[in-house]
């Protein structure tokens, strides 16, 4: 019986046309040993791998969809290549698999079935934003998306600010790019004037902007964010 393969977690770019700067050569080399992939969207995964210019033919690669709608019962079939002794890679739509990403489901399955998990180096917008924020990097929490409804969003912001103050904990959020300004407005409106707020937009991209000010300083500014991926962080 052949030795089983490994599950590789493969980061992708978090801003367009940044492959050369953020995807290490070690990842490109490792990718050459992987022909089977679990991806959120086959089209974007193929486009990303094509941009790295390491495969002679993308058509020879095998892709299976793993997204937020995937069920645990589907994983056994997805992991067939590993049982056959071949490596399997998880590609995130943006950044690191398993971090704010459905890849965590497959990673959990791998551990439960004694399959070696190998994380590869690459960009994470959440960690890069935290690094550049100047806020507490020893104690922090990522909350994903806040409620869309403004009233519910403001209520959640108040509760999380209270938690931040009690625990000295940085609170981290993301938002759909077209709602960036709505969330920024709610944060500036709902947070205490002395609370520190960082807004990081298009990290690693050509329009990268990472600014941190007390909320009272943000109130003096005209905040108009582009419709690009953004991370929001605050510390009370």
Write out the residue ranges for each language-model feature.
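Glycine-rich, flexible N-terminal cofactor/catalytic loop recognition
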Residues: 1-66
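Class I SAM-dependent methyltransferase SAM-binding "motif I" and its flanking Rossmann-like core
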Residues: 105-163
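A contiguous loop/helix-start segment that scaffolds small-molecule binding in enzyme catalytic cores
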Residues: 2-8, 86-87, 166-236
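Glycine/small-residue-rich loop that forms an oxyanion/phosphate-binding "nest" at active or ligand-binding sites
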Residues: 67, 75-117
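Conserved helicase motor
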Residues: 64-71, 146-150
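Alpha-helix capping/helix-boundary segments
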Residues: 43-45, 95-96, 125, 179
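Short active-site oxyanion
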Residues: 31-37, 114-118, 170-171
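Short glycine-rich anion-binding loops that position phosphate/pyrophosphate groups of nucleotides
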Residues: 14-16, 93-97, 177-178, 205
């Amino acid at each position: 019986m052949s030795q089983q393969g490994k599950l590789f977690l493969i980061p992708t770019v978090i801003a367009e046309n940044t492959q050369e700067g953020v995807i290490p050569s070690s990842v490109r080399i490792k990718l050459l040993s992987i022909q089977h992939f679990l991806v959120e969207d086959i089209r974007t995964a193929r486009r990303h791998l094509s941009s790295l210019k390491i495969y002679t033919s993308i058509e020879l690669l095998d892709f299976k969809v793993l997204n937020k709608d995937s069920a645990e019962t589907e994983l056994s079939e997805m992991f067939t290549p590993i049982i056959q002794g071949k490596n399997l890679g998880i590609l995130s739509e943006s950044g690191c698999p398993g971090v704010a990403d459905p890849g965590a489901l497959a990673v959990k399955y791998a551990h439960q079935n004694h399959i070696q998990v190998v994380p590869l180096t690459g960009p994470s917008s959440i960690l890069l934003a935290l690094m550049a924020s100047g806020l507490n990097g020893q104690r922090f929490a990522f909350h994903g998306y806040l409620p869309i409804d403004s009233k519910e969003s403001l209520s959640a912001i108040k509760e999380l600010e209270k938690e931040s103050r009690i625990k000295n904990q940085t609170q981290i959020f993301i938002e759909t790019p077209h709602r960036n300004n709505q969330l920024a407005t709610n944060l500036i409106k709902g947070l205490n004037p002395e609370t520190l707020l960082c807004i990081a937009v298009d990290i690693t991209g050509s329009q990268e902007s990472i600014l941190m000010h007390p909320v009272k300083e943000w109130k003096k500014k005209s905040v108009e964010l582009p419709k690009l991926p953004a991370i929001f962080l605050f510390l009370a």
